[in-house]
Amino acid sequence: MALDRAGRICVLAAAWALTASAAQAQTFELKLSHFIPPNHTFHKWALAWTEELTKESGGRLKFQIYPNGQLVGPPNRQLDAARNGITDIAFVLHGVTPGRYPTAELVNLAFSWPKAGSGSSITSKRMSELAPTYLAKEHEGLHLLFTAAAMPILIYSSVPIRKLDDFKGVKIRYSGVQNRNLLDALGAVPLLIQPPEAQDAIAKGIIQGATFPHEASLSLDLATVAKHATEPGLSTAPFAFAMNPAKYNSLPADLKAMIDKSTGPAAAEKFGKLWEAEEKRARDELIKQGVQIHTLSDADVAEIKRRAAPQIEAAIAAVDKAGKPGRKFFEEYTK
């Protein structure tokens, strides 16, 4: 009887070893979807990230990247596609689904960034540090890899905006509820246009301007239709880099550990530094392409901040009223 028991233990041990060995040998191919062109900073970062993971895993992790919405369509479908398993991983800005991620969209409020600065390395790292505590619930159904914030967004326009009064009546593409409210306060006419459609919308006269950093404006080829850019950046735009939870949980422990190690706040900071470098390069390149940079006066900036102040308070209060930790998140993010 003892031998029988020992035999069963040996059989079970052998079966476990074979299962573990099979998992070690199995290849996992993941689909990564995003909405932006291949010349955008995120796509370049994603290529390097996936290549590094493929190498580190000895070829057990492989990736197929789908830019420009090739896999799931418009930007506003990206995160739901990751939830539903149409794609395994997605990257998109929260503002393409206004009001759906209200806590994250507080990052979109005017001149609201950490005291350490508005650079993407700072904002992205800070947002990612806070995400597990404050943002996980409103991203239910997703495994957040990191969150990020773009460089401060400017107004790219076909008409010059040199001063505050020039905003009046100008139709401007916006991203996110908070940007819409700010443009309203400036007298502009905000219109919701998905990022890949901005250039065509300006060319057709549907809008006269759009809110983007220099880097995104270059990747979207806006200089062909918008020869004016207004600085300084008035706000920023939050993004999510997220994975389907079932797909994540289906991976062996060592592969999950590789993904964990290569994402999170440190990865967000690294991505942000790349974004910062590309922003400077893009600004220089756009000037070469004939874009004129207009700088608002200190008095105009002060007036914008004055108009934005009640909106900031109202936005935070609305998130709190909905039972979400708006004020706590905002205070932690901006301190």
What are these regions (language model features)?
Residues 1, 25-26:
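Absolute protein N-terminus
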Residues 12-13, 23:
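Cleavable N-terminal signal peptides
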